A protein has these predicted regions:
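Pre-NBD coupling/linker segments of ABC/ABC-like ATPases
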Residues: 2-5
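Non-catalytic connector elements of ABC transporters
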Residues: 257-282
Length: 282
């Protein structure tokens, strides 16, 4: 039987450290080493201040490490002479706020990263293809304020794909959306990952979002403290939340065992009910 060849490594960090502050030091990253293969769909979880966004900034050449190295597509980020060109051709970004220019149409917003790289005809062709890809082929002449929040984020995804980069970095791309729109956006990213082979790294606080990806990296205090492969039993939802530092939001009651009122993804809520039922029977 022929074995499926292993995907090449697209991203590698080696002992990556980022320290901020002239007085009291803040270690945003503390010796992070990881590898991400081409074609993976990965989420990064953890409490606020755990280093998630800093890690994305390092990979995307938006910040410099204090020590350690970052390789993306075989390139040492620190040795790049033109980081703008690298970001334009190799990495696309999708943030919590879409940052679309309000006076430009959806199509024109998508064409912005291609200016200087493609002629007008090629830009028009590519933007039309991308709007079809994200399900907005009939919205190309709409302004951002004529689109829903989920549609605006889809335009932002299309814009990130404009120059066909192998890597897309998403910092809370579903954070401003309701749960239904968030699931739809993650479904879109999954479809693009499968059909185009684009690698995605997505920062999120939402375990339901994480479960739509292949691998979850959990960070705390600037380190990767846990790694989960998606597809584990229902109880793993609770483990993921607890280890990511979000467990306090699940079970953080008084000494009498009372739980605070919160909203959880359905699978995590089922796990909570199961554990509470077992506790009541004991």
């Amino acid at each position: 039987m022929n074995e499926t060849p292993e995907a090449p490594c697209l991203i590698e960090t080696r002992d990556l450290t980022r320290i901020y502050g002239d007085g009291e030091e803040i270690r945003a990253l503390d010796g992070v080493s990881l590898k991400i293969a081409a074609g993976e769909l990965v989420t990064v979880m953890g409490p606020s201040g755990s280093g998630k966004s800093t890690l994305l900034n390092m990979i995307g050449a938006l910040d410099k490490p204090t020590s350690g190295t970052v390789f993306v597509d075989g390139q040492d980020i620190a040795a790049l002479h033109n980081k703008d060109e690298f970001r334009s051709k190799t990495v696309g970004f999708v943030f919590q706020l879409h940052n679309l220019i309000p006076t430009l149409t959806a199509r024109e917003n998508i064409e912005i990263p291609m200016i200087g790289h493609k002629g007008l005809g090629a830009r028009r062709k590519r933007s039309a293809e991308l709007l079809e890809l994200v399900g907005l082929g009939d919205r190309m002449r709409h302004l951002p304020n004529q689109l829903s929040g989920g549609q605006r984020q889809r335009v932002a995804v299309a814009r990130a794909l404009a120059n066909n980069p192998p890597l897309i970095l998403g910092d809370e791309p579903t954070g401003s959306l309701d749960s239904e729109a968030g699931r739809a956006l993650m479904g879109l990213l999954h479809d693009i990952n499968q059909s185009q082979g684009t690698t995605f790294i997505v920062v999120t606080h939402d375990v339901a979002v994480a479960r739509q990806t292949n691998r979850v990296l959990v960070m705390a205090d600037g380190k990767i403290v846990r790694e989960d492969i998606i597809g584990s039993p229902i109880e793993e939802d609770l483990k993921m939340w607890r280890h990511s530092g979000l467990g306090r939001r699940i079970v953080d009651g008084d000494h009498d065992g009372a739980l605070k009122a919160i909203t959880l993804p359905d699978r995590a809520m089922d796990a909570v009910r199961s554990l509470l039922g077992a506790a009541n029977r004991s």
